[in-house]
Amino acid sequence: MSEDNILTPQGWVRGRLLHQDGKVIAIEGSPCNPADNDLPYLLPGFIDLHVHGGGGKDIMQGRDAFQTITRTHVRFGTTSLLATTMTAPSEEIRQVLEQLGSYAEQRPQGCARVLGVHLELSLIHI
C-alpha cells in the first residue's frame, strides 16, 4: 500500500486508507501539510445533486444516455448523483423515470451511482 495525502473531516493526513468490501474501515497516518510532500491526493468522492447530462448526452435521452453520463461524471470525481429531468410531457418523464430506476438498480462498474432523481418541471400537479 502506498502513502497518500488523505483529506479527512479533521484535516489532512499522510498515511494509508484501509478498506474492505468497498468500505473505508480505517485511515492510518499522522497530520500533515500536503504542500510539504509530493504524495498523491486522496479525496472523498463528490455527490452532484443536479445533473442534466454529461459526455454530450442528456438524461432526457433515456436509457442509452445514462452510462455515458455516469461514466463521464465519475472521471471527474463525482461518485454519486441525482439525475435531473427537464420540463417535458408527463409520459416522456414517466418513461425516463422508469428507465432511471432500472439503471440505478444495475449499478454499472466504473460509473457514478444514481442515488435518485431531481424532478425539474414547470409545474407539478398532485
Q: Model-derived features: where do they sit?
A:
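N-terminal metal-binding scaffold of metallo-dependent hydrolase/deaminase domains
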Residues: M1-P31
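A short, flexible low-complexity segment enriched in Lys/Arg and Gly/Pro that occurs
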Residues: V24-C32, R94-G101
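Alpha-helical scaffold segments that flank or form the walls of functional sites
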Residues: Y41-L42, I59-A112
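Flexible loop residues that form catalytic
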Residues: H52, M86, S122
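Active-site microenvironments of hydrolase-like enzyme catalytic domains
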Residues: G116
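Conserved, mostly hydrophobic/aromatic
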Residues: L119
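Conserved small/polar residues in nucleotide/adenosyl-binding loops
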Residues: I124-I126
